[in-house]
């Protein structure tokens, strides 16, 4: 696949979840409203001429890390799902850090005035608050900050969706008995895998906590996400859709020959800094 395919109180959600004090620095991106102007069901305006740009950075091969077989299936499934939702998809495979930074810069400098929002996908290895390009690691901050309101004016007040599938070398979580008495064990999220989320208002960060077993059709997380986007992407509020994805993945046990993965559980996470409800309704 070729590269480049195609006034009153400040809402608390406008402050990043990881550091609310630091979040005040992003005041230009916060949504200021009076209590009477924003109802509990206010939605993002999604009737612009374009849905928006979606970048997919797909890292299968690395200079000094093991490869990620199966990521091509994730890439292709996401491409189809996002195109079906009317996003303009551009795919970049096995890019070096300098190339990723260049593509990020180009997208941040583009005019998004007639777009509903923006999507960025990164499929790679990851650790803490970094992701790996072909040759070096890049911080999550470096791929989010260029799209904040102080730098990308045409995306102010618009949803910015980040999907991060970052494998951690096969680490999985032991299931524990559900305190609710259900048959299915709950999943314990490995705290070491929680990424720093240096985003701001109108961002939503969607990411896998740990590595799901890779099959020919890709990772558990991306499989489930694409399935839910295909079934409910145009009808279900986006955070509700992500909750369904969490449930799907958490109920799936690794079924492979690796005895260390038998009965293991995985669960993705999302952190929403959205200030309104998000529906990706069909374009007219």
Explain the meaning of each model-derived region.
Residues 1-284:
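Cysteine endopeptidase catalytic domains of the caspase/legumain-like
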């Amino acid at each position: 696949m070729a590269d480049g395919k195609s006034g009153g109180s400040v809402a608390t959600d406008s402050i990043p979840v990881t550091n609310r004090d630091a979040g005040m620095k992003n005041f230009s991106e916060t949504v200021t409203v009076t209590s009477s102007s924003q109802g509990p069901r206010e939605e993002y305006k999604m009737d612009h001429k374009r849905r928006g740009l979606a970048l997919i950075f797909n890292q299968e091969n690395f200079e000094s890390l093991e490869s990620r077989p199966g990521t091509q299936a994730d890439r292709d499934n996401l491409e189809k799902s996002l195109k079906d939702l009317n996003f303009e998809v551009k795919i970049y495979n096995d890019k070096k850090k300098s190339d990723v930074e260049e593509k990020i810069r180009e997208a941040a400098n583009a005019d998004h005035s007639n777009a509903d929002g923006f999507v960025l996908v990164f499929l790679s290895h990851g650790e803490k608050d970094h992701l790996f390009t072909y040759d070096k690691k890049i911080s999550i901050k470096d791929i989010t900050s260029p799209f904040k309101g102080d730098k990308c004016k045409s995306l102010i007040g618009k949803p910015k969706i980040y999907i991060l599938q970052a494998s951690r070398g096969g680490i999985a979580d032991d299931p524990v008995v559900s305190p609710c008495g259900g048959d299915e064990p709950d999943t314990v999220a490995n705290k070491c895998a929680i990424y720093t989320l240096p985003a701001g208002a109108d961002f939503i960060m969607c990411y896998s906590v740990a590595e799901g077993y890779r099959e020919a059709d890709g990772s558990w997380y991306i499989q489930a996400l694409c399935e839910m986007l295909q079934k409910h992407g145009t009808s279900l509020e986006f955070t509700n859709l992500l909750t369904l994805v969490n449930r799907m993945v958490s109920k799936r046990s690794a079924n492979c020959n690796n005895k260390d993965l038998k009965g293991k559980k995985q669960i993705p996470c999302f952190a929403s800094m959205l200030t309104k409800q998000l529906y990706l309704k069909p374009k007219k």
